[in-house]
């Protein structure tokens, strides 16, 4: 059932203002309020000197107004006294520059000192507020790793080296796994190994392993706080919001009660883009509806009833809980100009009227339906934490392209009226008639076996370009590609060419063919494969270039199912859509 609310910062206001705001929140249809996530310095004004009286009063005021609370742990913004006492908790960027205090997320969650202080404030908050009946849920931290750089502080370097020792045992094993003979990079001492960062022309193996280590750090950081909350508030939901790419969000949200995220609509966001982010969020914890912990109070497009449209769209894609950021504008500080429902001088802003109207219209109607199930999806899109780093690092690095491929494949399904889940490699594929794999550089034997079983039993899979050519260390496999999947796709990939479309001012390499009798054609972009069919059917061939006349797209029947392969990164979105819709038709999925 749809539950609406907002983010609120009572540390900014006096009791009279809080009373007024609480009454108005309830009157417009709100039930939930998120507080506390940036209030550490107001809760602990100096080391060990806690001040919670004001927050108790907030709980009581909200309780009187029948408002439930999501209480945020305030660890996204450390107080100045803590930084002054322990400057070593500040993160350090790739070039050795320490963060400047005064912003948020300028601390390193690897730091044992910072974790100790974070645990202490969370323990005190649990002790103070666990008994309130209107304590509805906890939010841990805020937007972990959204703004922060990849930290390279001494604690991170030391932790990374210990992680490598546990994984590889010896330096010889590291050198062999990472192929460090290239660029004279062989290690003779553990202290020589520096933690990596994205897009710095570093060894891709180092970058991949660095991101795996950082992910474990973030998971442990969240778990440290979650364990404290579970002990003191058993049964209460625990969430967090919008973690960045360095966190394996499938793994993270399995440890929490639901997947939580933020979504701010701007003019660049069309409906398919919004649908993608909602489906991605829902897929992080299958079977549990996601929580939208921040969304726009004032959608940027000046379109009548847009907020109502978005509210319905969010709900239709699974968001039972929708909290809007934020209620009342800050009178000062960095985000004083951020969108809100109530302006700096107390006047209602246009978004509040839109919200009131939408809530009044929708809440009674949706209440009749009760709890809605998640959208039924017959198609899955593979999203893998490792793949985004294995795919993008190295010569002609393309960090943003993995996410772009996911969004494009999702949008093509969306355009055909097909709902899809974004799923990790260990998901149960059998619930899907169609599985799209935009890019999956490393194919393990275990994953290959599961994929073969899926197709053998009747599934349809489409594998995109640049898949199945790397090992688990981001090195090339020693056989033809796609790794462990030649029999499934009925082909071998023996070579490839990587290029830029801009390198061909007079027209790029093209390929063409037929999908179910329909003629298709596209220019290539970035990458083409040298495909040698074993027993695959050729759907498209290259029209020009070194691979002229060779296959570009193939189809292979395997057991009861079908395996499609596209050995070219297509620059034409129309072609890509035709390919995906053809795959959907083979899977028996109706198209709009």
Regions found by a protein language model. Give the residues of each.
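Short, well-ordered coil/turn segments that N-cap beta-strands
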Residues: 1-4, 29-31, 63-69, 131-136, ...
